[in-house]
């Protein structure tokens, strides 16, 4: 057996040494299309391993390209191009031995000419591939594609010359000519290459546009777009950018002196157009450089003496006197005083008494007699005594007044501690005096939240009253915030914790005289003073939601409010987790103060915590109540700073590259792309008084009525889901129910009030306590949008408890505007007490948190394919810009152009818009219109999986 096997081995070795593969290779030379799959070899060898594979190449002009391939161990290596074997004559083969392993390394090289590539027909590019043989089998290399390189001469779009004002944004567009490979683009400024890394005022977008963020005078230059690849270099036409400066007036100089020193004249002042001076063709200052005005200088009047008086009787000194005054006229307006003496004297005894003539200004005049000094001192003493008496009287009065105020404070404090505090939902008994049934001070129609000060009702304010009823139009609402003040805490600013519904948890049936209830309020007040640090935490589950997110992203949603926060995939850095929260701020202090025709259009929403590092924008969705008509509104997004004041973030249609966010405005909501979390609110300002905002009218009645009185509360709210949900929760605590489905009212910026009235009341069984025919809410209280739960109350009285049917019409309309009519029909005994509970606890009404891929409609694989296909600029414009246009997101494309993946940001915005329905039909339709059929196939395939 051993001899037989040895003979077989010797025979096999002889055959291997004698075998020649030349016939097969000759078949290749003669046009054969196939090589044997394997050659006889020793079974110990391994499969060939490629050390060098052919790479993609471009044929420049007519120069052929060389393809190299190296493998070991390999007995043969051949190229196969477009499915056909390359002739053996076209191969250049080199062999060497690996010193470490002793294996044979074979390297093969071929050339591919331009003619070979041009002769190829079909849609696929010309390709070549290496096939290496060894005794163990064959190995194929990667495919290398060979293309003919070119670069067309004409640009698809060239930059245009522009003249722009100083500090404005400049956009220079450039679409390079078509070429293979795709041309690289650079910009020249006066023949110097622009490097955005060195000058951050320049920005090169992903579609090769040049943006100057804020034009400077030094940016006045010639700009050229340069496209180049391995074939050629093309230059666009030069675009000249001129940055001009419009002239500005300097401050007015001082008025010149009046032209006339006396009487009417003129004076002028001047200014110059040098702040700044116009440059580079900028406009000259508008207005006058000189102003003139009339002036009147009062003329000076010199004083003049009156006539001398008659001589006085002769004195004991043998002299008599006469006087005169400087009053004819007196000196005025800087005139000169009279010159001369005021008194004159002379001897009156015809020489019997020899006395020299004396005058008032004679230095030898006689001194005052001692009797004059005594009178002077006596007067001073009397004056001192009078002053002391006055001071003592004032001191006594002040002392008595302080004592009286102190007694009052003690009385007020004791009253607050022993039952002086009346809860808001307690109604005092009406006095027997019939005159008191008609108070002179009418109720406040517009108060929506009160501050309780001692025993006075919060909603019984005296401001903005309308005399039309004898009962409060606004019943006190127990769930409103209440601040308790006494003589020791007034002015301290401390109150109950924000958002705490204190009265909603009190035991029913208690009254102001109940000491336990007063003690309960005092306890809550003291507890709130020590818990101020808890005010910022999102505690109300109906208006807040939180979750922990990683790099996969997710979504926070407060159902029933239209408020959500989308955290895209990749927004949070890899390996980090953020605890995010979303909250609707319910207090009026969290809303900005409206000025002029400004109004709050959305709820104030906080997403946090602030200061987190985000790798891509998140999308905050808030509802709004504006009737969006082009040209009627000036929309703004505002944020609340750390100091509490509100700052403007962006004005829509006035965005620049420095704008930190983007707003996508829909008919009833606004989607905001944010780089920073914080507190935001959407506001609007009426443009030329033509804006219209939507109101939501809702009528509530008590679910249980055991008295003769019956009240209807008509709420006038912003037409947002969040506003209605807040009122539903409020009415549930009051024991009310929604009488009829809410209706929408268009409220115009016309300064006209909102009028509410009742009609068709069955007077045989009911009577209205409203003295006037209607009630009105002032226009500004409705328009500013910063007052919560704005409503009016209609109080009715039935003649007997047997009357359980009530019908009427409620008309709500704006004076000289639109209106709505409610037809009410209710049965007091059969009122569905649980209607509000059903609304407030409807399915999906709990806050939701979606994490990871489940929060998104587009699978991640499809999203990546769409981004890879559309992010790169296309000369035909069939890229992300067209997608933004198809999805109506092209209001400000420069925002997306500055992002690393514009398509990804657009898809994030699409995800936020599709929160409710969420099908892919709209996106699929847009891709189909763009001609991206391969994306539709991917969406169908991956979507089914």
UniProtKB/Swiss-Prot annotation:
CDD domains: Death_UNC5B
Extracellular compartment segments: 27-377
Site (Cleavage): 412-413
Domain Death: 865-943
Residues listed as glycosylation sites in the UniProt record: 222, 347
Residues covered by the Ig-like C2-type domain: 153-242
GO annotation terms (biological process): anterior/posterior axon guidance; apoptotic process; axon guidance; negative regulation of extrinsic apoptotic signaling pathway in absence of ligand; negative regulation of neuron apoptotic process; positive regulation of extrinsic apoptotic signaling pathway in absence of ligand; positive regulation of phosphatidylinositol 3-kinase/protein kinase B signal transduction
Residue segments, region Interaction with DCC: 707-725
Gene Ontology CC terms, in alphabetical order: membrane raft; plasma membrane
Family: Belongs to the unc-5 family.
Complexes and interactors: Interacts with the cytoplasmic part of DCC. Interacts with GNAI2 via its cytoplasmic part. Interacts (via death domain) with DAPK1 (via death domain). Interacts (via extracellular domain) with FLRT3 (via extracellular domain); the interaction is direct. Interacts (via extracellular domain) with FLRT2 and FLRT3 (via extracellular domain), but has higher affinity for FLRT3. Identified in a complex with FLRT3 and ADGRL3; does not interact with ADGRL3 by itself.
PANTHER family per record: NETRIN RECEPTOR UNC5 (PTHR12582), NETRIN RECEPTOR UNC5B (PTHR12582:SF6)
Record-given protein name: Netrin receptor UNC5B
Species whose genome carries this gene: Rattus norvegicus
């Amino acid at each position: 057996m051993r001899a037989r096997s040895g003979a077989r081995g010797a025979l096999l070795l002889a055959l291997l040494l004698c075998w020649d593969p030349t016939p097969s290779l000759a078949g290749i030379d003669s046009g054969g299309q196939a090589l044997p799959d394997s050659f006889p070899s020793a079974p110990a060898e391994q499969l060939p391993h490629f050390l060098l594979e052919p790479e993609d190449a471009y044929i420049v002009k007519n120069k052929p390209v060389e393809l190299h391939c190296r493998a070991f161990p390999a007995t043969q290596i051949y190229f196969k191009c477009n499915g056909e074997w390359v002739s053996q004559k076209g191969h250049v083969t080199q062999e060497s031995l690996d010193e470490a392993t002793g294996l044979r390394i074979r390297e093969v090289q071929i050339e591919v000419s331009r003619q070979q590539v041009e002769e190829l027909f079909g849609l696929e590019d010309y390709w070549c591939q290496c096939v290496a043989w060894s005794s163990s089998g064959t190995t194929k290399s990667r495919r290398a594609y060979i293309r003919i390189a070119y670069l067309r001469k004409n640009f698809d779009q060239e930059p245009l010359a522009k003249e722009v004002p100083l500090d404005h944004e400049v956009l220079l567009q450039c679409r390079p000519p078509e070429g293979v490979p795709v041309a690289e683009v650079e910009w020249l400024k006066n023949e110097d290459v622009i490097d955005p890394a060195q000058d951050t005022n320049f920005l090169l977008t992903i579609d090769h546009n040049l943006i100057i963020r804020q034009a400077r005078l030094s940016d006045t230059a010639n700009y050229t777009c340069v496209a180049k690849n391995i074939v050629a270099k093309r230059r666009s036409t030069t675009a000249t950018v001129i940055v001009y400066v419009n002239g500005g007036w300097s401050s007015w100089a001082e008025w010149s002196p009046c032209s006339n020193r006396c009487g009417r004249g003129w004076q002028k002042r001047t200014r110059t157009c040098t702040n700044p001076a116009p440059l580079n063709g900028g406009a000259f200052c508008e207005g006058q450089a000189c102003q003139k005005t009339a002036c009147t200088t009062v003329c000076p009047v010199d004083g003049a003496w009156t006539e001398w008086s008659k001589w006085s009787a002769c004195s004991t000194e043998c002299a008599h006197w006469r006087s005169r005054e400087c009053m004819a006229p007196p000196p005025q307006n800087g005139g000169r005083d009279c010159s001369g003496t005021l008194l004159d004297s002379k001897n009156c005894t015809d020489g019997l008494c020899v006395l020299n003539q004396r005058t008032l200004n004679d230095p030898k005049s006689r001194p005052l007699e001692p009797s004059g000094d005594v009178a002077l001192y006596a007067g001073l003493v009397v004056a001192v005594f009078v002053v002391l008496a006055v001071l003592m009287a004032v001191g006594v009065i002040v002392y008595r007044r302080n004592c009286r105020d102190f007694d009052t404070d003690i009385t007020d404090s004791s009253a607050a501690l022993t039952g002086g505090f009346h809860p808001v939902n307690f109604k005092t008994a009406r006095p027997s005096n019939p005159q008191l049934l008609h108070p002179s001070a009418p109720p406040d129609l517009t108060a929506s939240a009160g501050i309780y000060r001692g025993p006075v009702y919060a909603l019984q304010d005296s401001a903005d009253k309308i005399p039309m009823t004898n009962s409060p139009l606004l019943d006190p609402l127990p769930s409103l915030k209440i601040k308790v003040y006494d003589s020791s805490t007034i002015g301290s600013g401390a109150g109950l914790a924000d958002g705490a519904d204190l009265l909603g948890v009190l035991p029913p049936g208690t009254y102001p005289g109940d000491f336990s209830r007063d003690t309960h309020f005092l306890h809550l007040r003291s507890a709130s003073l020590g818990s101020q640090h808890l005010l910022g935490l999102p505690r109300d589950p109906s208006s807040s939601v939180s979750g922990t997110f990683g790099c996969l992203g997710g979504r926070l949603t407060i159902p029933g409010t239209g408020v959500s926060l989308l955290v895209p995939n990749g927004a949070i850095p890899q390996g980090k987790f953020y605890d995010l929260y979303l909250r609707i701020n319910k207090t009026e202090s969290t809303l900005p103060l409206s000025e002029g025709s400004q109004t709050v259009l959305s709820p104030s929403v906080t997403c946090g915590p602030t200061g987190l590092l985000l790798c891509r924008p998140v999308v905050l969705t808030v509802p709004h109540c504006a009737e969006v008509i082009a040209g009627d509104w000036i929309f703004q997004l505002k944020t609340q700073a750390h100091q509490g004041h509100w700052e403007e973030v962006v004005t829509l249609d006035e965005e620049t590259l420095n704008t930190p966010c983007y707003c996508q405005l829909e008919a009833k909501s606004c989607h905001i792309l944010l780089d920073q979390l914080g507190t935001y609110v959407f506001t609007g300002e009426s443009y030329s008084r033509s804006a219209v905002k939507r109101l939501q009218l809702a009528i509530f009645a008590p679910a249980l009525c055991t008295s003769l009185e019956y009240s209807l509360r008509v709420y006038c709210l912003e037409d947002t889901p969040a506003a209605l949900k807040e009122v539903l929760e409020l009415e549930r605590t009051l024991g009310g129910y929604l009488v009829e489905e809410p209706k929408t009212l268009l409220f115009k910026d016309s300064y006209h009030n909102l009028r509410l009235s009742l009609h068709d009341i069955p007077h045989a069984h009911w009577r209205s306590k409203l003295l006037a025919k209607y009630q009105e809410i002032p226009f500004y209280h409705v328009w500013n949008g910063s007052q919560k739960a704005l409503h009016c109350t209609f109080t009715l009285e039935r003649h007997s408890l047997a009357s359980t049917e009530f019908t009427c019409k409620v008309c709500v309309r704006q004076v000289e505007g639109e209106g709505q009519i409610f037809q009410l029909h209710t049965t007091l005994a059969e009122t569905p007490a649980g209607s509000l509970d059903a609304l407030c606890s409807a399915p999906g009404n709990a806050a939701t948190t979606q994490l990871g891929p489940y929060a998104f409609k587009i699978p991640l694989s499809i999203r990546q394919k769409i981004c890879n296909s559309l992010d790169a600029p296309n000369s035909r414009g069939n890229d992300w810009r067209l997608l933004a246009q198809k999805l109506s997101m092209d209001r400000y494309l420069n925002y997306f152009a500055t992002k690393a993946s514009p398509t990804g940001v657009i898809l994030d915005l699409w995800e936020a818009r599709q929160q409710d329905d969420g099908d892919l039909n709209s996106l699929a339709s847009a891709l189909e219109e763009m001609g991206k059929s391969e994306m539709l196939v991917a969406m169908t395939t991956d979507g089914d999986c």
